[in-house]
């Protein structure tokens, strides 16, 4: 039977010495966001009324990074065990709510598994998440009598017989708030570690005749913790393999699932193709029949139907309408917008710029703070000079303009519809509709000229 409310405690006070880092362990990232954020997200999706984050090492950096006003920050000044950590949070527990305990360094725990654990919690008892391992060395063992859970024995305190038990404690459990506070008040540190173990509440509950229901996760990897960078890298690959599998089964063609990283949320239309070594970050939407070439990075962008992004292009905070083509080696920075059928070629960079329908910037170009009309040709080497050393200014180019190669447009400047800018021109004044503009130095020919001779 479920209580009407539930709060979550996330233990995140450890320094993570084996990470060999000045950054708190739980802030190391998996799939582009801190491990602890994955756990917070799971708690939120589960419907937690309150999330208590128990912190210690690097608390200020934790607060600066997470920036979540809904978190209740609970300081554990001394790390005296998991039971001690829960004791710091206990004053915030309501008697009539359930308390779910999670860990900031166990990032793959799923909402589905936690919901099953919550559903399985007996009235007045404890829901406990356990797994069976071929090699349970180092983990707390689940002790049973006649099939019923009676307690948890930490590895260092276990007898040889108990160490043969393969069912181990994951550390994740749920109990009523009033019961949790009572059991926490009875904990002692009379053990090999001299710490207060949260696991001792299992024996206390059993002694009171309370039922302990053990639940297994859908995947063992959900309960894997991180103590070093090797373990973190392994969980990263597990997570990415799971995301790739979901995409493949939903109809997305990943040419090499083992070389695809999703570090955010991806929504795809029909018949999307993604080549090897592509990284998706933030919130990305790909329309129908979109093709992403090898080595591309797409972040917080919307890509319209039938667009093709050629290899090694970077697209960030950009919006592409239908049938646009990008790259290879193109860079769309925040604020870039391509209207239907526009083309951005190799070594072209756009920032806060709009390229109109059917317009093309094929090679070696910078378009910043610019508004470019429809059917415009931007020649190779064109630069919108948008910065005077203090302020940014805008360039406006009308429809059907032809901009020759090696042109500089010194903003603020406007080029009218149908104008032609000759190659090598520096445009410093507004250009009227249909004008031809050129600013070349007259070409000089010197007959009989000889190159200088190198001095010996």
UniProtKB/Swiss-Prot annotation:
Spell out the Pfam families in the cross-references.
Hexapep, NTP_transf_3
One MF annotation (Gene Ontology) recorded for this entry: glucosamine-1-phosphate N-acetyltransferase activity
- Listed transmembrane segments: none
Among its keywords, does the record have rRNA-binding? no
Q: EC number(s) per UniProt?
A: 2.7.7.23, 2.3.1.157
Recite the UniProt cofactor note for this protein: Binds 1 Mg(2+) ion per subunit.
Q: Which reaction does it catalyse?
A: alpha-D-glucosamine 1-phosphate + acetyl-CoA = N-acetyl-alpha-D-glucosamine 1-phosphate + CoA + H(+); N-acetyl-alpha-D-glucosamine 1-phosphate + UTP + H(+) = UDP-N-acetyl-alpha-D-glucosamine + diphosphate
Question: What would be one Gene Ontology cellular-component term for the protein?
Answer: cytoplasm
Q: Under which pathway is this protein filed?
A: Nucleotide-sugar biosynthesis; UDP-N-acetyl-alpha-D-glucosamine biosynthesis; N-acetyl-alpha-D-glucosamine 1-phosphate from alpha-D-glucosamine 6-phosphate (route II): step 2/2; Nucleotide-sugar biosynthesis; UDP-N-acetyl-alpha-D-glucosamine biosynthesis; UDP-N-acetyl-alpha-D-glucosamine from N-acetyl-alpha-D-glucosamine 1-phosphate: step 1/1; Bacterial outer membrane biogenesis; LPS lipid A biosynthesis
Region ranges (Pyrophosphorylase): 1-229
Q: Which residues bind UDP-N-acetyl-alpha-D-glucosamine?
A: 11-14, 25, 76, 81-82, 103-105, 140, 154, 169, 227, 333, 351, 366, 377
Localisation per UniProt entry: Cytoplasm
- Region annotation N-acetyltransferase: where it falls in the sequence: 251-456
Question: Which GO BP terms apply?
Answer: cell morphogenesis; cell wall organization; lipid A biosynthetic process; peptidoglycan biosynthetic process; regulation of cell shape; UDP-N-acetylglucosamine biosynthetic process
The residues listed in the UniProt record as binding Mg(2+), with positions renumbered to this chain, are 105, 227
Alphabetized, the UniProt keywords read: Acyltransferase, Cell shape, Cell wall biogenesis/degradation, Cytoplasm, Magnesium, Metal-binding, Multifunctional enzyme, Nucleotidyltransferase, Peptidoglycan synthesis, Repeat, Transferase
Active-site positions, per UniProt? 363 (proton acceptor)
Q: Which residue ranges are recorded for the region named Linker?
A: 230-250
Q: Which residues bind acetyl-CoA?
A: 380, 386-387, 405, 423, 440
Q: What does the similarity note say?
A: In the N-terminal section; belongs to the N-acetylglucosamine-1-phosphate uridyltransferase family.
Q: What does this protein do?
A: Catalyzes the last two sequential reactions in the de novo biosynthetic pathway for UDP-N-acetylglucosamine (UDP-GlcNAc). The C-terminal domain catalyzes the transfer of acetyl group from acetyl coenzyme A to glucosamine-1-phosphate (GlcN-1-P) to produce N-acetylglucosamine-1-phosphate (GlcNAc-1-P), which is converted into UDP-GlcNAc by the transfer of uridine 5-monophosphate (from uridine 5-triphosphate), a reaction catalyzed by the N-terminal domain.
Query: Subunit structure, briefly?
Result: Homotrimer.
Protein name according to UniProt: Bifunctional protein GlmU
Query: What organism does this protein naturally occur in?
Result: Salmonella typhimurium (strain LT2 / SGSC1412 / ATCC 700720)
Phylogenetic classification of the source organism:
Bacteria, Pseudomonadati, Pseudomonadota, Gammaproteobacteria, Enterobacterales
């Amino acid at each position: 039977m479920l209580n009407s409310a539930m709060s979550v405690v996330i233990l995140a006070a450890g320094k993570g010495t084996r990470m060999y880092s000045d950054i708190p362990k739980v802030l190391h990232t998996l799939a582009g966001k801190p491990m602890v954020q994955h756990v917070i997200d799971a708690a939120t999706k589960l419907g937690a009324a309150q999330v208590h984050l128990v912190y210690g090492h690097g608390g200020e950096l934790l607060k600066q990074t997470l920036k979540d006003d809904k978190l209740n920050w609970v300081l554990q000044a001394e790390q005296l065990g998991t039971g001690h950590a829960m004791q710091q949070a206990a004053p915030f527990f309501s008697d009539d709510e359930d308390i779910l305990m999670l860990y900031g360094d166990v990032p793959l725990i799923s909402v589905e598994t936690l919901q099953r654990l919550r559903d399985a919690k007996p009235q007045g008892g404890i829901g406990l998440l356990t797994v069976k391992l071929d090699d349970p060395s180092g983990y707390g063992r689940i002790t049973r009598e006649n099939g019923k859970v009676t307690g948890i024995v930490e590895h260092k305190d276990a007898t040889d017989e108990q160490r043969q038990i393969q069912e181990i404690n994951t550390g994740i459990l749920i109990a009523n708030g009033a019961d949790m506070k009572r059991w926490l008040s009875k904990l002692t540190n009379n053990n090999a570690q001299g710490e207060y173990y949260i696991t001792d509440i299992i024996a206390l509950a059993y002694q009171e005749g309370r039922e302990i229901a053990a639940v297994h996760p859908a995947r063992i990897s959900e309960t894997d913790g991180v103590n070093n960078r090797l373990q973190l890298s392994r969980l990263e690959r597990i997570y990415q393999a799971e995301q790739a599998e979901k995409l493949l089964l939903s109809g997305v063609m990943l040419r090499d699932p083992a070389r695809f990283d999703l570090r955010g949320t991806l929504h795809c239309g029909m018949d999307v193709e993604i080549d090897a070594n592509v990284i998706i970050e933030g919130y990305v939407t790909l329309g129908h029949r979109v093709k992403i070439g090898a080595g591309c990075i797409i972040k917080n962008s919307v890509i319209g139907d039938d667009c093709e992004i050629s290899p090694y292009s970077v697209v960030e905070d950009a919006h592409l309408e239908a049938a646009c083509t990008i790259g290879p080696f193109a860079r769309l920075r925040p604020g870039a917008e391509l209207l239907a059928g526009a083309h951005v070629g190799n070594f072209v960079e756009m920032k806060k710029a709009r390229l109109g329908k059917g317009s093309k910037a094929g090679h070696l170009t910078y378009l910043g703070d610019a508004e470019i009309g429809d059917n415009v040709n931007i020649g190779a080497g064109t630069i919108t000079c948008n910065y005077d050393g203090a302020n940014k200014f805008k360039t406006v180019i009308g429809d059907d303009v032809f901009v020759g190669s090696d042109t500089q447009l010194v903003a603020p400047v406007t080029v009218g519809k149908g104008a032609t800018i000759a190659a090598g021109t520096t445009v410093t004044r507004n250009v009227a509709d249909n004008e031809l503009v050129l600013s070349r130095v007259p070409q000089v020919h010197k007959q009989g000229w000889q190159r200088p001779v190198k001095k010996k």
